[in-house]
């Protein structure tokens, strides 16, 4: 099975400007992400950026680059531009990896592509089990609820499902007894290329605007998303300077 990885690499991050070029163990961060994508077995890896400096660095380490607009409001809009510019066939599987995930396990990149190929859906993703109450109640940890076959019922920053008997008078989140139903969504997606174009035809929905989760547009419009448990839990991504230092320490040991 062939699949293409697209890695968006925005230069103007509000919390960590220029992070695609941040040095980690002697390489720019975006090169680490690119190398992980190659290790997944992808037949093509494309880095999508809106910055000429990033594009020059990417070309220097031998990766394919696609220049995109600076005006996109979401990562999906950037993917759609790449798909259109490069005339990627509608049936091609596209895996979207964030450009700030230098520690992403290659095995889960392959897994999400396989997940899409196995099921009659246009979009697939992964999740991991939630093991502590702090993560469960953290709005930055997106929860996902599925049916018995792994098809998504809903994504939320709130706790879903809500355990009425346990949570109603909860005093200490550390004392929560967690059921297997509690899953944290991992922000890695696989799509059919043509579906990305279809997605762009739908107007933003109230649900996604409230939760700030663009994948809810897919559910709202009646499409299904399949989610599997990730074979490996990904390590920290890089959103802040503190995250960057953590990743540098991890890769310095390798």
Swiss-Prot record:
It is an enzyme of class 2 (transferase). Pathway: Nucleotide-sugar biosynthesis; CMP-3-deoxy-D-manno-octulosonate biosynthesis; CMP-3-deoxy-D-manno-octulosonate from 3-deoxy-D-manno-octulosonate and CTP: step 1/1; Bacterial outer membrane biogenesis; lipopolysaccharide biosynthesis. GO terms for molecular function: 3-deoxy-manno-octulosonate cytidylyltransferase activity. It is found in: Cytoplasm. PANTHER family: 3-DEOXY-MANNO-OCTULOSONATE CYTIDYLYLTRANSFERASE, 3-DEOXY-MANNO-OCTULOSONATE CYTIDYLYLTRANSFERASE, MITOCHONDRIAL. NCBIfam families: kdsB, PRK05450.1-3, PRK05450.1-5, PRK13368.1. This is 3-deoxy-manno-octulosonate cytidylyltransferase.
């Amino acid at each position: 099975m062939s699949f293409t990885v697209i890695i968006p690499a925005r230069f103007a991050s509000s919390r960590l400007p220029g992070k695609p070029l941040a040095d980690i163990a002697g390489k720019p961060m975006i090169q680490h992400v690119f190398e992980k994508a190659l290790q997944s077995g992808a037949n093509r890896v494309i880095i999508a950026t809106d910055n000429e400096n990033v594009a020059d660095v990417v070309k220097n380490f031998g990766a394919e680059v696609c220049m995109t607009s600076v005006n996109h409001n979401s990562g999906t809009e950037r993917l759609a531009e790449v798909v259109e510019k490069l005339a990627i066939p509608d049936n091609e599987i596209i895996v979207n990896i964030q450009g700030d995930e230098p520690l992403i396990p290659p095995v889960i990149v392959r897994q999400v592509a396989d997940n899409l190929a196995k099921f009659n859906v246009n979009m697939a993703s992964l999740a991991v089990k939630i093991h502590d109450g702090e993560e469960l109640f953290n709005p930055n940890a997106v929860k996902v609820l599925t049916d018995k076959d792994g098809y998504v019922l809903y994504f939320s920053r709130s706790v879903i499902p809500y355990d009425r008997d346990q949570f109603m008078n909860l005093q200490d989140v550390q004392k929560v007894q967690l059921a297997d139903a509690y899953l944290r969504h991992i922000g890695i997606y696989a799509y059919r290329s043509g579906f990305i174009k279809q997605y762009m035809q739908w107007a933003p929905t109230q649900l996604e605007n409230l939760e700030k989760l663009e994948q809810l547009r897919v559910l709202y419009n009646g499409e299904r998303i399949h989610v599997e448990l990730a074979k490996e839990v990904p390590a920290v991504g890089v959103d802040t300077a503190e995250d960057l230092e953590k990743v540098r320490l991890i890769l310095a040991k390798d």
